[in-house]
């Protein structure tokens, strides 16, 4: 079983739609991905449909972190948990949409959730 720090993946430049400069004063010097949440599978972690998520590609993932990861050919926002007994990782969903957890030997981790910009709904 690989250490969490060994699971980091690189985003293919072809997958990046656009880039923006973010204020250093607010976000520091970290490399960030900005993605939009789709669906309500992570509401238990404060992530709702339409929220803007800031993902740090510089931070090392730890068990319990919410990460952007790829498993079974799909990319997800999930909490990553280590199952040392089985030598696997669990990508845990927590929301109103009852999604199954994913157990995998080697997920590709793109980064760790750092900030959430909430969508205002009147």
Describe the residue ranges of each PLM region.
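Hydrophobic beta-strand signal
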Residues: 34, 54-55, 68
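A short glycine-leucine-enriched loop at secondary-structure breakpoints
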Residues: 44-48
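Flexible, small-/acidic-enriched active-site or ligand-binding loops
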Residues: 94-100
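Structural motif
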Residues: 50-51, 65
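Short, positionally conserved secondary-structure boundary motifs
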Residues: 1-43, 60-63, 74-75, 82-87, ...
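Short hydrophobic/aromatic-rich beta-strand motifs
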Residues: 67-68, 80
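Short, solvent-exposed secondary-structure boundary/capping segments
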Residues: 87-94
């Amino acid at each position: 079983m690989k250490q969490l720090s060994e699971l980091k993946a690189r985003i293919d430049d072809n997958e990046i739609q656009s880039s923006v400069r973010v204020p250093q004063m607010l976000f520091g010097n970290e490399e960030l991905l900005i993605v939009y949440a789709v669906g309500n599978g992570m509401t238990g972690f404060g992530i709702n449909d339409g929220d803007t998520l800031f993902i740090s590609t510089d931070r090392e993932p730890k068990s319990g972190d919410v990460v952007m990861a790829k498993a079974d050919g799909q990319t997800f926002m999930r909490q990553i948990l280590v199952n040392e007994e089985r030598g696997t990782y669990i990508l845990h969903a927590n929301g109103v949409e009852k999604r199954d957890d994913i157990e995998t030997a080697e997920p590709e981790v793109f980064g760790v959730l750092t900030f959430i910009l909430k969508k205002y709904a009147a």
